[in-house]
């Protein structure tokens, strides 16, 4: 559970960092860029700890996919960006891909000990 919380923190800080980059680029000074650097750095730190117990493919797909989903939603709400039918279709495809990756990942079993050979 702890590693899933770390992954959630990685996703939240990635979203915050990316949105602050946009915020800074529309003229709000250096504070946005500083916030971006801090948040993106924290995001990678949280992600690096999360992948200790979560499969890398799953963690990265969730981190990037959920990040893209929420960044797109917040970009529409906060920065008046357009949300076309194609973008919606892309986001739905992204969500379907995340679900497939997550559901198709199995926990590794315990390693099987190699049988010892009897010498004749």
Curated annotation (Swiss-Prot):
Subcellular location: Cell inner membrane
GO cellular component, one term: plasma membrane
Primary location class: membrane
Domain of life: Bacteria
Membrane-topology annotation of the record: Multi-pass membrane protein
TM segment ranges: 1-21, 31-51, 54-74, 81-101
GO molecular function ontology, one term from the record: spermidine transmembrane transporter activity
A Pfam family this chain is assigned to: Multi_Drug_Res
InterPro entries: Small_drug/metabolite_transptr, Small_multidrug_res, Spermidine_export_MdtJ
GO biological process, one term: choline transport
Record keywords: Cell inner membrane, Cell membrane, Membrane, Transmembrane, Transmembrane helix, Transport
Record text on subunit structure and interactions: Forms a complex with MdtI.
Family: Belongs to the drug/metabolite transporter (DMT) superfamily. Small multidrug resistance (SMR) (TC 2.A.7.1) family. MdtJ subfamily.
Known role: Catalyzes the excretion of spermidine.
Protein name stated in the entry: Spermidine export protein MdtJ
Natural source organism: Salmonella typhimurium (strain LT2 / SGSC1412 / ATCC 700720)
Gene: mdtJ
